[in-house]
Amino acid sequence: MPTINQLVRQGRTVEVVKSKSPAMENCPQRRGVCTRVYTTTPKKPNSALRKVAKVRLTNGFEVISYIGGEGHNLQEHSVVLVRGGRVKDLPGVRYHIVRGSLDLQGVKDRKQARSKYGAKKPKAK
């Protein structure tokens, strides 16, 4: 425990909180252009081919972001909207691409959790 004299001389240092998604620069979403669309494999106990894209954001950052849902229509030079949010079993993937926005279509035939995948409400029969 410091003395009063030490506190007068030095003062307390405030802990700096490090951002979990620094490329967003405190914005909720960012627009970007896909530079590479590919699949990658997850960490140890899991096994799959996860769809990811390398995206060059409008602020100059180049990030790897995850494409959620079944199937997608992304190619190189597609314009996408990127949000924060990591993928636990993919190291280095700290962002998600927003479905149903800009060039990325929503998930087809999606019935539940539609808002997360940009799917329209199906026609009632």
From Swiss-Prot:
Entry's family note: Belongs to the universal ribosomal protein uS12 family.
Example of a GO biological process term: translation
Record's GO cellular component terms: small ribosomal subunit
Species for this entry: Acidovorax ebreus (strain TPSY)
Protein name as it appears in the record: Small ribosomal subunit protein uS12
Molecular function GO labels: rRNA binding; structural constituent of ribosome; tRNA binding
Top-level taxon of the source organism: Bacteria
Keywords attached to this entry: Methylation, Ribonucleoprotein, Ribosomal protein, RNA-binding, rRNA-binding, tRNA-binding
Assembly notes: Part of the 30S ribosomal subunit. Contacts proteins S8 and S17. May interact with IF1 in the 30S initiation complex.
Modification type 3-methylthioaspartic acid: residues: D89
Cited function: With S4 and S5 plays an important role in translational accuracy.
NCBIfam families: rpsL_bact
